[in-house]
Amino acid sequence: MFAKLFLVSVLLVGVNSRYVLVEEPGYYDKQYEEQPQQWVNSRVRRQAGALTINSDGTSGAVVKVPITGNENHKFSALGSVDLTNQMKLGAATAGLAYDNVNGHGATLTKTHIPGFGDKMTAAGKVNLFHNDNHDFSAKAFATKNMPNIPQVPNFNTVGAGVDYMFKDKIGASANAAHTDFINRNDYSLGGKLNLFKTPTTSLDFNAGWKKFDTPFFKSSWEPSTSFSFSKYF
């Protein structure tokens, strides 16, 4: 068992863990302001999808197609592909989403991560406060990780976080996740500044800090910055 725990810990350090554990919102939150990492919208959007290019060389596309609903509720099918800075597949996701005009939502998705395996994620978001200037939401997710490593069993990750946005211009987020199997905790803090926006394009500056700890590895807070350009369609 110790060897298995150590192996999974090493794997999660080596594999791009933004796809495995905390959805540090990263890519999805920038496009559908989401969770884990998880496309739970703050308001029901009309766009069917988006393409995003990041300054670190990563990129991705997400498509969200309404299935049924009305002006207050919407059920959609969604899919996405993330590419690494070497134009290789980082993650591919498909699933279902529910959005409410008041900012509440939920998703059920399956993601394939090359070099790791698959994961199933259920995520939800509740809008706690919204007016013309402020938007504040809480979110949570539960993920079943299914690694394709011999003799390593499936394991679960749970997490939660909060998102804040001021005038659709300045945003902040805080997230935490826990994985029992390897006793790993992940933490992330993030900020976002919108530099330019039209109904179909957005240019943003992103900054963040993240850390993790396990019985075998502990990291310090690691800073990151990036620019991202998104085209909605």
Swiss-Prot record:
The keyword Translocase does not apply. One of its GO terms (cellular component) is extracellular region. Residues 1-17 form the signal peptide. Its main location: secreted. Keywords: Antibiotic, Antimicrobial, Cleavage on pair of basic residues, Immunity, Innate immunity, Repeat, Secreted, Signal. Hemolymph antibacterial protein. This is Attacin-B. It comes from Hyalophora cecropia. The lineage of its organism: Eukaryota, Metazoa, Ecdysozoa, Arthropoda, Hexapoda.
